[in-house]
Each structure stands twice: as C-alpha cells, then as structure tokens.
Amino acid sequence: VSDPAQIEGMLNNLVYNLFARSGQDDGRATGAKEIGNLIVFDHPESVDEIVKSPALFRKNFSLISALGFSRFNTNDEEWATRRAITQDRYLAAAKPPHGQSVSDIFSGDLADCETSLAGIHQALFTGAMTIFYQAFGLVAEARPTAVLFDRVRETLRRLQYYSWVTPTNAERDSAIQDARAVIADFGSQLMADPRAAAEMDRFSERAAGIDGFSPIEEFVMNLFAGVETTVTTVQWVIDRLGANQQVQERIYSEIADGKAQTPFTDCFINETMRYFPPIPFLTREVSTDAVLDGTSLRAGQLIMLSVVGVHQHPEFWENPRTFNASRKEFINNSFDRRAFIPFLTGPRMCGGARLGRLEVEQAVRAVVRQFAFTRADDVIRFDYALALRPASGMSVQMSRR
C-alpha cells in the first residue's frame, strides 16, 4: 500500500498548485488553464456556467465512490431522490429559532474541552456532530463516532489519491476493502440504536426506486460533508485570528456587545472562506462534446473547477491574494455572487448551506468568547483530504479569557 506521507504530499501539492496559479491576471477574459493533462476552469463566469449545467457537466468522483453513493456523487433523478431524503431535515435545523440551541451546544463543548488546539478541534467536532445527529432526531456517541470519522477521512484520502494516481490491483483492492469495512462498522453502530435504525428505514422508504440503495452510505457521506466543512472553516478562523491580534480584539468586542448584527465578524468569516475554501476544487465529467470559452471538450473528459481560482480571480476581487479582514467587497456587500462559492452554487449546491453557515457563525462566536489566540509565525500550511484544513502542528497558542 502506498506510503501515507506520499499520498498526503501529492494531494497537498495539487492544492498548492491551484493556489500558485490563482489571483494573477494572465490577460485572458475567461478560458481554461491546465494542470498536467487536466483542463482547469477558474473564471467565475465559466465555473458558474458549468455548475448550472448539471446535465452537460456531471459529477464523477471516480474511486471515491467506493465508500458509497449519496446525493454528493450521483446525478439526474437519482440525485433528486437522494436530495429529498435529507433536505427537509437540513432546512428545519437551520431555522433562526435554532440559533440559540446551536450556540449552546458549541459553548458547552468548548467550556469543557482541554485548552489546546486538539481540545478545541475535538469540541468543535463533537458540537457539529451533535447538531447533525439532532437534525435527524438522533443522539451521537461522540467517541466511537470520532474514531469512525477519522477512518472515513483517511479512507477518502487514499481513494482520492488513487483517482489521480493509478493504483496497483493490490492497492485498489485494499482501499476498497477498507472503505467497505468502515461503512459496515458505521452501520453496526447506527443499527444498534433503535432510533437510528428507524431513521435508516425512513431513508430506504424514500429511496425505494433506487436499486441497491444503502441508507448507511447516504448518512455517512452526509455526516462527513456536513461536519468536516464546518469544523475546518472554524479551524481556519482560529488560525487567522492568531495572526491578526487587533482584528481578534475587534471581533471579541463586537461579539461581547451581544448585538444581533456583527458585520465585522461576518466579514471576517467570509474572508476566511474566500481565502481557504472548504472544498478547494471539484471535478466534472463532460457528457457530450462541447465548447466552453473557446476550449473544445470531448464526451467523457474530466475537467477541474478551481474554487481557489474563483475566489482569487483578479477581475472580481481587489488584491485577491491578500487576506483582508476588512475586505470592502464583503463590508459593502458588493461582491459578485459568482465569485464567492464556499457552498458552491447552482442546482447542485450544498443542501446544508444554511445550517453550515449557522453552525460556523455560532461556533466562531463561542470560540472567541472563551479563547484568545496568538501565532509565533504566519506560515500557512494545510492538510487536504476532500476538505482543506490547517495542518496539524500549526504554531497557534491559546489561552482562556
């Protein structure tokens, strides 16, 4: 089996490449770029056209689908059926009256956690997982679920790596076996709880028309997507707070005032998601021969959509490669919506976007009320496995307020 460090290095280098190519004016109005043999689109107008044309540009997650199928990696009527299983739960959980409950969950977990990055990460994970389970009327078992969650992340990392680098038969078989094993273990945990078993039955009833439907796969993929993106975003907020002391105190003062509106904090969260998009890129498969921005595409061809590039496009952002806590495009609400897509856009955008945004806002408030952060340096390092999180060992120090 491939060296984990090799897998991590290759995937991180792919994202570093996207950052290196972004934010620079190459003189082209639109058009595509290339990474190796892969065509990359990063102009907001082009990417907007792609994501709003799901019949022409279809989801294709290659070997990642060995972990299972869900609303995130299916198309057409099957996608619509899977979406309907979970969408009402997400919308209900994101209603404004639930904001206080979300705040209380994160505040309680952070109050009890160890004063360390690892402790805060665990508290954020536990809070986000609790909120996700509650959306489906369930109660999570924090520790065993955390272990399974980490296994899902590492399995997805390997599967994604093998989607780019052709594995040997032994490597492929091992990765698929591990994927099936973690899904089976998740299933055993869920089905041991009568409430979870009943909810999985509801999933199956709603998906009666899908051959081979697995409610466990649907649940696990939704869980991973929802929790991982929320936690990684708040981790990046913490990282940037540590690097911006004056900004941190301004945000603390704004939150401590207890006002319903926190425009500077909201701007800072947006700038964090712009600079460090939770999902840095997507891939799509072209369903039929087409031409986009003068680039000829053939049926079956894979293309990349660089969210990093969209978020740093110089036509749409002033000094896009600079992290600006007071970015005027956000303060003035003047940004082009096509150029800011942390939850994606179009008919296949993140179904839990409202809930995710609510969680991030409340988690950041809870973190800032309880902790102060500093950084010994401002070297940015990350760890990519579907979602973009800060690398472990970052030089962030913290203390309780």
What are these regions (language model features)?
Residues 53-56, 305-332, 353:
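Conserved cytochrome P450 K-helix/beta-meander segment immediately N-terminal to the heme-binding cysteine loop
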Residues 1-67, 339:
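N-terminal membrane-proximal hinge/A-helix region immediately C-terminal to the signal-anchor transmembrane segment
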Residues 81, 86, 329-365, 379-387:
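Cytochrome P450 heme-thiolate "Cys pocket" and heme-binding signature region
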